[in-house]
Structures are given as structure tokens and as C-alpha cells.
Amino acid sequence: MCRDVNVYYGEKHAIQNVSLDVGHNEVIALIGPSGCGKSTFLRCLNRMNDTIVGCRVTGSIRLDGQDIYDGGLDVVPLRAQVGMVFQKPNPFPKSIYENVAYGPKIHGLANSKAELEEIVESSLRRAGLWDEVKDDLAKPGTSLSGGQQQRLCIARTIAVSPEVILMDEPCSALDPIATAKIEQLIDELRELYTIAIVTHSMQQAARVSQRTAYFHLGRLIEVGDTAQVFTNPRHPLTEDYITGRFG
């Protein structure tokens, strides 16, 4: 639940008074022209913007009733609870196994080697990658194809049992076949997680999301059921973007 969220980069007002609710076990797509603020807003949801010098966030973002911007909040467990999959696959310089096992190890989620192995296997299965790598778990994660690396990053994210998964253009560096696999995976993961995805592809937003939010110049212009946003947008700016009159 986000209320009156504003983001400043120095003097630049990048996100302006955005309020948005995200439902449990739904996929919400954030769309809009380049530079409209959708990725900046996404990064607010697990405080990734904290790493940017000069960035300031105001307003309220609540998860399980707690404002994630409370001064005393530890961001390490927050970023396990709200995982992130980036635009470019970024596996650790470790084996496939260690890429997935690393998070559960540092968060103390496994009490034995057998339990850790179970987490690794179940995470790779949920990411649709187990059958492709089960005999090569000792190989470097970087040895996989781009699409496999992105699914490995998704497995790494879900290995720490998040509630929410944030995806920032997860398919932009992938070919159509790899993209189709990721989209199918997103649909399957919705049964277990809430997902917010930034995408430049309106076709992808239409395929994978239940709701769509349209951003323009740092403002949330419209949010609604995906079918409604694409077929009967309420705001002229949304209609102009959907129909290709600008963007």
C-alpha cells in the first residue's frame, strides 16, 4: 500500500504524489514512456533507491502493516521479503548451486545440508530451470544462456521465501523464446507471490498482468484492470500512449 509517495534526486522531483495499492497474488504491470518514473517507483518498494546518493523518498509504503521507510527498519530482511529481478541477468560469480543457496545460508533458512539442498531444488523447479541444470549444479551460473541466467536469478530470489517479487524489465535482454518462458513463469509464480513488473512492452503487460498502472512524467495517471486500461482507458494521456500517439 503506497500513499503520497514522492521521490527526489537532489532538486529533481522524479515521482510525484503516487498512491497505489497492490493486491496479494496479482501481477501488476507498470508501463509508460522512458523516463516516466516507473523503475524509480519500483525501486522504492524495497528501498533500492537508498543506494543512490542524493535520493530522498517521502510518503508511506506499507508492507504487512509496517511502513518500510520507518527509521529503525533493517533493509536486509526487507529485501528478502521484497525480492528484485533486474533488467540484465546478474548471477553471482559462483556455481549454479551456490547462486541459489547463498540467500538461504545468510538468512539462516536451512538447518542442515539436506534442507538447503531441498530449498535449492524447489527454487530451481519453481523457476522452471531444474531439469536443465540438475546435472550441472557445480558449473558457473555465468555459463548459462541469457534466459537461463534470468531464471536462475528468479530462483535465487524465491529461495529466500519473499512475499513480493519486483521485476524491472526482466525480458528486455532476452530473445523471444526465452521471453516466452519467463512470461509463463510469471503466470505460474503468481499463485505464490505478488509480482510488480516494469515493462516497455505493452503486449507483455497485456499478457502477464491482471492490473496495469500507467506513469507519465513522474505521475501515476491511471491504474485499473489490464483489459480495461488497454481497451477503454479513462485518461487521454493513457489513450495517447496505448495508441502510439506518443511514447
Curated annotation (Swiss-Prot):
The record's comment on protein family reads: Belongs to the ABC transporter superfamily. Phosphate importer (TC 3.A.1.7) family.
Q: How does it sit in the membrane?
A: Peripheral membrane protein
Tell me the classification of the organism that encodes this protein: Bacteria, Pseudomonadati, Pseudomonadota, Gammaproteobacteria, Methylococcales
Q: What class of enzyme is it?
A: translocase
Which SMART domains does this one have? AAA
Localisation per UniProt entry:
Cell inner membrane
Could you say which EC number(s) this protein's record lists? 7.3.2.1
Biological process terms from the Gene Ontology for this record are: phosphate ion transmembrane transport
Write down the PANTHER family for this protein, in alphabetical order. ABC TRANSPORTER I FAMILY MEMBER 17
Q: Which organism is it from?
A: Methylococcus capsulatus (strain ATCC 33009 / NCIMB 11132 / Bath)
Task: Enumerate the SUPFAM superfamilies for this protein.
Answer: P-loop containing nucleoside triphosphate hydrolases
Pfam families the record matches: ABC_tran (PF00005)
Sorted alphabetically, the Gene Ontology cellular component annotations on this record are: plasma membrane
What GO molecular functions are on record for this protein? ATP binding; ATP hydrolysis activity; ATPase-coupled phosphate ion transmembrane transporter activity
The protein's matches in PROSITE patterns, at most eight in alphabetical order, are given as: ABC_TRANSPORTER_1, ABC_TRANSPORTER_2, PSTB
Answer whether the UniProt record assigns the keyword Transferase to this protein.
Answer: no
* InterPro entries given in the database record: AAA+_ATPase (IPR003593), ABC_transporter-like_ATP-bd (IPR003439), ABC_transporter-like_CS (IPR017871), P-loop_NTPase (IPR027417), PstB-like (IPR005670)
Asked whether the UniProt record includes Transport among its keywords, one would answer yes
Record's subunit section: The complex is composed of two ATP-binding proteins (PstB), two transmembrane proteins (PstC and PstA) and a solute-binding protein (PstS).
Write down the superkingdom of origin: Bacteria
Give residue ranges for domain ABC transporter: 2-242
Which residues are ATP-binding? Answer: G32, P33, S34, G35, C36, G37, K38, S39
Query: Coiled-coil stretches, from where to where?
Result: none
According to its UniProt entry, the function of this protein is described as:
Part of the ABC transporter complex PstSACB involved in phosphate import. Responsible for energy coupling to the transport system.
Q: Which UniProt keywords apply?
A: ATP-binding, Cell inner membrane, Cell membrane, Membrane, Nucleotide-binding, Phosphate transport, Translocase, Transport
Q: What is this protein called?
A: Phosphate import ATP-binding protein PstB
